[in-house]
Amino acid sequence: MGFITKAIPLALAAASVINGAEIMETRAGVQTLADKYIVVMNDGMTDKDFDSHRSWVNRTHRRRLIRRGAKAMGGMKHTYRFPTGLKGYSGHFDEQMINEISKRADVKYIERDARVQINAIEQQDNVPSWGLARVGSKEPGGTTYYYDGTAGEGSTAYVIDTGTDIQHEEFEGRATWGANFVDDMDMDCNGHGTHVSGTIGGKTFGVAKKSNVVAVKVLDCNGSGSNSGVIMGMEWATKDAQQKGADKAVANMSLGGAFSQASNDAAAAIAKGGVFLAVAAGNDNVDAADSSPASEPSICTVAASTEQDSKADFSNFGQVVDVYAPGDSITSAKPGGGSQVLSGTSMATPHVAGLGAYLIGLGKGGGPGLCDTIKQTAIDVIQNPGASTTSKLINNGSGM
């Protein structure tokens, strides 16, 4: 499937406490990264206090390496400063250093960094796409996509994924490279991100055919990355969107994994910053409340439907799901030109991000409130949606 994950099965993280600071534990089966951690600071911390804490970490780490002959570790790698106030950092520390950090009163919690990765992707050649027609029609089985000519003009979609082939003809020069937090290749060598971007803003496959697309790469050629790297991409997208106008921005995250408080907090920071964020519910046919960032309530969580208006058998479900969108056998762009057919909640999510961009083009407003707007125009048609799950399927309100 197209959803990016590693945790099977997913579950709420257990928590432990080491000398005061909470350590968010991941369950068995989740691939944690050895001696790598994400540290999140207390709410309301000032920049001055954060800088002081970082200086203390660097001094203490160096002292341990030099004076105590501690095991060589890389120390602090990246700091997070979301415009909405969330602060933290990731790094490579031994247990003793984490114990020292945990004693600090200014630390909210510490989380072990974990791997995220694309699951097997279903591919079927030469199958016509149906998702666009379904978004623009109140009845299934259509072959025409009805939409307003504004088509998301003036909006910007941040695709936090494997990158995007920005030269693909589908984007007509509207796609740009934003940032790369996983490797030194500014290209989509996997294909997942280009497919997602095409569903949002492609001239043929896109819901919002005139929207701008910004590639934010957080996963490598194998579709592999880390929670800390994904959060770096989320931070960058939030800052860039605020500089250019958050009310005109949407973000898409067709990725996830086991419950991560840090991932959820970063997603909440994007929404608090005024950016509409659509996130995949997951492909394990379990309750999405046990995965992140899908379980964050302030974002728009998307499950996958079939051409027959039923829940896709792989799709996660549950109360955290906001809407269903087409996610089974979806045709979109592939790197180097042409198209491919993929399935997953990864494919459903850009239909929702694209619809958000489309509504921005119509002057319906932006920000996290777009999820409520999308739910209001959705139609009640999904069969067997899953326990405690909405049966709403997205619709662009064209009236057809």
UniProtKB/Swiss-Prot annotation:
Residues 129-400 form the Peptidase S8 domain. It comes from Arthroderma benhamiae (Trichophyton mentagrophytes). One of its GO terms (biological process) is proteolysis. The keyword Iron-sulfur does not apply. Keywords: Glycoprotein, Hydrolase, Protease, Secreted, Serine protease, Signal, Virulence, Zymogen. GO terms for cellular component: extracellular region. It is an enzyme of class 3 (hydrolase). Glycans are attached at residues 58, 222, 252, 396. The active site is at residues 161, 192, 346. It is found in: Secreted. Residues 1-20 form the signal peptide. This is Subtilisin-like protease 7. The gene is SUB7. Belongs to the peptidase S8 family. Secreted subtilisin-like serine protease with keratinolytic activity that contributes to pathogenicity. One of its GO terms (molecular function) is serine-type endopeptidase activity.
